Amino acid sequence: MAYPFELGFQDATSPIMEELLHFHDHTLMIVFLISSLVLYIISLMLTTKLTHTSTMDAQEVETIWTILPAIILILIALPSLRILYMMDEINDPSLTVKTMGHQWYWSYEYTDYEDLNFDSYMVPTSDLSPGELRLLEVDNRVVLPMELPIRMLISSEDVLHSWAVPSLGLKTDAIPGRLNQATLTSTRPGLYYGQCSEICGSNHSFMPIVLELVPLKHFENWSSSML
C-alpha cells in the first residue's frame, strides 16, 4: 500500500524490499549526521571571530578527515554489497515468466507451460468497476505463486521500457535485443501494482503492471483454467 502524498515507500512484500528499506534508513541516518555536523561547523565559523590564520600544517586534522570518510564509506558499502548479492540470480527458480514490453502494453509468457501466454492492456477509465484504480488496472493480471522464487526475464519488442513493481523492490529495464533478469519472492498474497518506468512514447503512462500473488494451490487452479 502506498502512503498519502508519496511521503514514504510502499509497504514491502518481499525480503529484498525489506532489506532495501532498512538500507535506506541506515544510509539516511548517516547522511543526516554528516549534514548536521557540516551545518554546525558552518554556523560556528559564521558566528565566531576566532580564526587561525597562521596555521600551516595540521597532521591530526588531515588524518581524521582521511580516516573518518573511509570508515563511513565502508559502513555504507558493506550492507549495499550484501543486498546486491541477495538480488543476484537464482540457480533453481520455481517458475520463469518472460515479459516483453510493447508500445504500449505488456505481454507475458509462462515458459514452464506449453501454451500459457497473454497480453496485458490497461483498462480504460470508462470501463472501470467501483473500487478499481484509475490508470493501474489491466485486463489480464500476472498471477504468480507466493513464497516461491520466481525468475522474470524482461525484454522489449520496440523501444526502451522498464518493468517496475515498487512494493517488491523491482525495477528492470526492458531493452530491445537484450534479455534482462529479475528475481522476486512474495511473503504474502495480494495485488501489487507497478508501471513502465522508462519514458517510451506518448502512451508511456498507460501501460501498468498488476501482479496477483496467490497460494500455490490457487495458482495451479488458475494455470489449469488458462490452458
Swiss-Prot record:
Q: Which UniProt keywords apply?
A: Copper, Electron transport, Magnesium, Membrane, Metal-binding, Mitochondrion, Mitochondrion inner membrane, Respiratory chain, Translocase, Transmembrane, Transmembrane helix, Transport
* UniProt topological domain (Mitochondrial matrix) ranges: 46-59
Name the membrane topology term. Multi-pass membrane protein
Residue sites binding Cu cation A2 per the record: C196, E198, C200, H204
The prosthetic group or cofactor this protein requires is: Cu cation
Q: Where does Mg(2+) bind?
A: E198
> What's noted on cofactor binding?
Binds a dinuclear copper A center per subunit.
Enumerate the residues binding Cu cation A1: H161, C196, C200, M207
- Give the location in the cell: Mitochondrion inner membrane
Q: Which reaction does it catalyse?
A: 4 Fe(II)-[cytochrome c] + O2 + 8 H(+)(in) = 4 Fe(III)-[cytochrome c] + 2 H2O + 4 H(+)(out)
Question: What spans does the record annotate as topological domain Mitochondrial intermembrane, numbered to this chain?
Answer: 1-14, 88-227
Task: Supply the Gene3D superfamilies for this chain.
Answer: 1.10.287.90, Cupredoxins - blue copper proteins
Q: What is its EC number?
A: 7.1.1.9
Main enzyme class: translocase
- Function description: Component of the cytochrome c oxidase, the last enzyme in the mitochondrial electron transport chain which drives oxidative phosphorylation. The respiratory chain contains 3 multisubunit complexes succinate dehydrogenase (complex II, CII), ubiquinol-cytochrome c oxidoreductase (cytochrome b-c1 complex, complex III, CIII) and cytochrome c oxidase (complex IV, CIV), that cooperate to transfer electrons derived from NADH and succinate to molecular oxygen, creating an electrochemical gradient over the inner membrane that drives transmembrane transport and the ATP synthase.
Q: Which PANTHER family match?
A: CYTOCHROME C OXIDASE SUBUNIT 2 (PTHR22888:SF9), CYTOCHROME C OXIDASE, SUBUNIT II (PTHR22888)
Family per UniProt?
Answer: Belongs to the cytochrome c oxidase subunit 2 family.
What does the record note on quaternary structure? Component of the cytochrome c oxidase (complex IV, CIV), a multisubunit enzyme composed of 14 subunits. The complex is composed of a catalytic core of 3 subunits MT-CO1, MT-CO2 and MT-CO3, encoded in the mitochondrial DNA, and 11 supernumerary subunits COX4I, COX5A, COX5B, COX6A, COX6B, COX6C, COX7A, COX7B, COX7C, COX8 and NDUFA4, which are encoded in the nuclear genome.
Q: What is this protein called?
A: Cytochrome c oxidase subunit 2
